[in-house]
């Protein structure tokens, strides 16, 4: 496995797909990085030369990925919570942040349902 940005990317896959294993790199960014490095998207990771890998690493060093990106996202969420914004409150309570309905769905965000005792007759 080739090691790029602190992540072991799979050797047998095409490089454009292998790069998506890095947090913060999707297909679009991977394509842009490869175009800038002058590497074909159809090349397998195992077939890359050290020079090509070096170019890709150099370009990825300029992009915020992995730990730096995760840290920035967490700091943004903490900031929202600290300033007491509506979005911060939703994060704190573990509810959907972007205006989704919570009457019926939102189980992913709310977690498993908690049974409430019914009224006795």
UniProtKB/Swiss-Prot annotation:
GO terms for cellular component: cytosol; small ribosomal subunit. Residues 91-121 are annotated as: Disordered. Keywords: Ribonucleoprotein, Ribosomal protein, RNA-binding, rRNA-binding, tRNA-binding. GO terms for biological process: translation. The keyword tRNA-binding applies. GO terms for molecular function: rRNA binding; structural constituent of ribosome; tRNA binding. InterPro entries: Rbsml_uS13_C, Ribosomal_uS13, Ribosomal_uS13-like_H2TH, Ribosomal_uS13_bac-type, Ribosomal_uS13_CS. SUPFAM superfamilies: S13-like H2TH domain. The keyword RNA-binding applies. Gene3D superfamilies: 1.10.8.50, 30s ribosomal protein s13, domain 2. It holds the Pfam family Ribosomal_S13. Residues 106-121 have a biased composition (Basic residues). Part of the 30S ribosomal subunit. Forms a loose heterodimer with protein S19. Forms two bridges to the 50S subunit in the 70S ribosome. Located at the top of the head of the 30S subunit, it contacts several helices of the 16S rRNA. In the 70S ribosome it contacts the 23S rRNA (bridge B1a) and protein L5 of the 50S subunit (bridge B1b), connecting the 2 subunits; these bridges are implicated in subunit movement. Contacts the tRNAs in the A and P-sites. Belongs to the universal ribosomal protein uS13 family. This is Small ribosomal subunit protein uS13. It comes from Listeria welshimeri serovar 6b (strain ATCC 35897 / DSM 20650 / CCUG 15529 / CIP 8149 / NCTC 11857 / SLCC 5334 / V8). The gene is rpsM.
């Amino acid at each position: 496995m080739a090691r790029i940005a602190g992540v072991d990317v799979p050797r047998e896959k095409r490089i454009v797909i292998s790069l998506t294993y890095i947090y913060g790199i999707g297909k679009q960014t991977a394509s842009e990085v490869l175009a800038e490095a002058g590497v074909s998207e159809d090349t397998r990771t195992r077939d890359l030369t050290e020079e090509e890998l070096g170019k890709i690493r150099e370009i990825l060093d300029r992009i915020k990925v992995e730990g730096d990106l995760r840290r920035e996202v967490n700091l943004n969420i903490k900031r929202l919570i600290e300033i007491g914004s509506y979005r911060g409150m939703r994060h704190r309570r573990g509810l959907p942040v972007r205006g989704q309905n919570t009457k019926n769905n939102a189980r992913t965000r709310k977690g498993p349902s908690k049974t409430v005792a019914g009224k006795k007759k």
